[in-house]
């Protein structure tokens, strides 16, 4: 089973396209929607929903993935639920990048302070990161510098921030999921 979390643009038709692409490596792809506007509520909702679908699935190696803000949540929720994660162009600091877009971006900072200390060290090797060199939203060299001591990073040469085509990375995802 693969759980897919959308980014900030939850209504993008690209979300459906990504789910269809993910079905090439796993028939059971679950799309979990969340508000993007209320971080504390989103975290509670995502923890509950992800735990529920993990319990329902008959998969010894479930995987959670997302793009941008969805990648942020994939890493945290995946860690808390004990499943592997794949992040595409993660928004690592939504407390800064979401300022002006949502009412309470400081809630992300509060979430970070309440998260397990050094969770990336404890999550070592449980997350695969795919970064685009053409990300127009984030400087992924900074993202790589923050994550490369914990996770394997794959660079993509062509995709923009929303990562429309994940198909080039499906085999790496499948190998990571089943390893």
From Swiss-Prot:
Disulfide bonds: none
InterPro entries cross-referenced by the UniProt entry: AB_hydrolase_fold, UPF0227, UPF0227/Esterase_YqiA
Pfam families, sorted: UPF0227
Tree of life domain: Bacteria
Gene3D superfamilies: alpha/beta hydrolase
Record-stated family: Belongs to the UPF0227 family.
Designated name of the protein: UPF0227 protein VIBHAR_01524
Organism: Vibrio campbellii (strain ATCC BAA-1116)
């Amino acid at each position: 089973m693969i759980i897919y979390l959308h980014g900030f643009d939850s209504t993008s038709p690209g979300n459906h396209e990504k789910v269809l692409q993910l079905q090439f490596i796993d028939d059971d792809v679950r799309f979990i929607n969340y508000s993007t506007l209320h971080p504390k509520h989103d975290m509670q909702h995502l923890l509950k929903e992800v735990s529920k679908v993990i319990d329902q699935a008959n998969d010894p190696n479930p995987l959670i993935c997302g793009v941008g803000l969805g990648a942020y949540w994939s890493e945290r929720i995946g860690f808390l639920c004990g499943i592997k994660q794949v992040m595409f162009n993660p928004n690592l600091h939504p407390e800064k990048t979401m300022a002006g877009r949502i009412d309470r971006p400081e809630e992300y900072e509060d979430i970070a302070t309440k998260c397990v200390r050094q969770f990336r060290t404890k999550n070592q090797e449980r997350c695969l990161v795919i970064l685009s060199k053409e990300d127009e939203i984030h400087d992924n060299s900074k993202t790589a510098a923050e994550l490369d001591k914990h996770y394997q990073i794959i660079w993509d040469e062509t995709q923009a921030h929303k990562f429309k085509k994940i198909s080039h990375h499906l085999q790496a995802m499948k190998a990571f999921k089943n390893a």
